[in-house]
């Protein structure tokens, strides 16, 4: 998906940043932030425009990582960059009104919304967005990941062959570090 988005939108660089603590996902991640960042680093090897980032590292006192804070930081850090895009799955974007400061989120960056299994991009039409906000939303068909992260974790936990779902080096890391019940 990352390659398709980078090529389609002619992105110079793509930051890939795991989130330490997502406020809308109770229970948190099933692997540590350090392990998830290490897997992102593995995925970025050999991809000139991909850059792993720890910008959503754990906060002081385990406070949640809010997207608005991350995007404000990026907007300030890359103030000379006219276009900044955030890439999100349709399932998450449809929940945008539950996020902190949703109207500001739609104003400070552009959003590339990719289809996800069970979430048609046509559902974006039902979102209560102004024309100005809609101008910052770019639905992208045809990059649906055939499997979700939950399905990958289940596959690993059940001991099934996941080699077609997960790159070899990432799968090796998962096994070496006994992640996801492997």
Q: What annotation goes with each model-predicted range?
A:
Residues 1-182:
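Nucleotidyltransferase catalytic core that binds NTPs
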């Amino acid at each position: 998906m990352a390659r398709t988005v980078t090529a389609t939108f002619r992105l110079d660089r793509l930051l890939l940043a795991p989130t330490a603590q997502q406020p809308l996902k109770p229970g948190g991640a099933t692997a540590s932030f350090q392990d998830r960042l290490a897997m992102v680093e593995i995925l970025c090897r050999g991809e000139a425009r991909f850059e792993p980032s720890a910008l959503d590292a754990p906060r002081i006192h385990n406070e949640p990582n809010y997207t608005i804070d991350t995007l404000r930081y990026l907007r300030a850090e890359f103030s000379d960059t006219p276009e900044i895009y955030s890439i999100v799955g349709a399932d998450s974007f449809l929940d945008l009104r539950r996020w902190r400061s949703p109207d500001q989120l739609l104003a400070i960056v552009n959003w590339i919304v990719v289809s996800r299994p069970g979430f048609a991009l046509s559902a974006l039409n039902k979102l209560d967005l102004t024309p100005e906000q809609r101008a910052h939303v770019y639905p992208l068909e045809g990059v649906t990941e055939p499997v979700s992260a939950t399905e990958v974790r289940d596959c690993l936990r059940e001991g099934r062959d996941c080699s077609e779902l997960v790159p070899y080096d990432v799968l090796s890391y998962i096994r070496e570090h006994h992640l996801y019940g492997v």
